[in-house]
């Protein structure tokens, strides 16, 4: 199964099974597309979790200030989109298990990208805490179930990436 090891310089080595590669590729690909989408054209639920439009209004940030804030966040996401393009090139091919290497300086962006995918999928299905329990996943069907599987898998992957290495 999935293993993540931390190297001496902070880089990570992953050992993936074929289905894990497929899931990660799918998550990165769809997140890259969403990153390239102008914030105003995103599903409003997604726009709100990624760009906090509602939150900005609540704290009185409006008009041009709000636009600059959202633009800044979008720029950061476009930067991650470029990184994700590189990750997809170096991941094992679809349908294959294999090892993968992530540089130390990209760990934070990788985790942020996976988290964005989780937030987006939860927003698309308007999932709350209760929906994220494993029992709820077992009962759900179709696209919602796929979203829940992705959310849980990526949470686990993030945990493995961030865990303190036991010496």
Segments from the language model and where they lie:
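Extended intrinsically disordered, low-complexity coil regions enriched in Ser, Thr, Gly, Ala
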Residues: 33-42, 118-131
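Short, solvent-exposed segments of well-ordered alpha helices
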Residues: 8-11, 15-18, 63-75, 98-108, ...
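Hydrophobic/aromatic-rich, well-ordered segments within soluble, folded domains that form packed cores
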Residues: 100-127
């Amino acid at each position: 199964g999935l293993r993540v090891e931390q190297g001496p310089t902070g880089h990570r080595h992953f050992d993936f099974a074929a289905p894990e590669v497929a899931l990660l590729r799918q998550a990165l690909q769809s997140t890259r597309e969403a990153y390239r989408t102008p914030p105003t054209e995103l599903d409003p639920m997604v726009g709100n979790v990624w760009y906090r439009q509602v939150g900005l209004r609540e704290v009185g940030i409006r008009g041009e200030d709000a636009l600059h804030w959202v633009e800044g966040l979008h720029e950061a996401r476009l930067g991650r989109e470029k990184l994700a393009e590189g990750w997809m090139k170096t991941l094992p091919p679809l349908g294959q298990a294999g090892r993968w290497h992530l540089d130390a300086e990209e760990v934070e962006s990788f985790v942020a990208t996976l988290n964005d995918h989780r937030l987006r999928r939860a927003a698309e299905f308007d999932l709350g805490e209760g929906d994220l329990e494993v029992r709820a996943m077992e009962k759900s069907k179709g696209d919602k179930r796929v979203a829940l599987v992705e959310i849980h898998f990526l949470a686990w992957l993030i945990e493995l990436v961030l865990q303190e290495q036991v010496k």
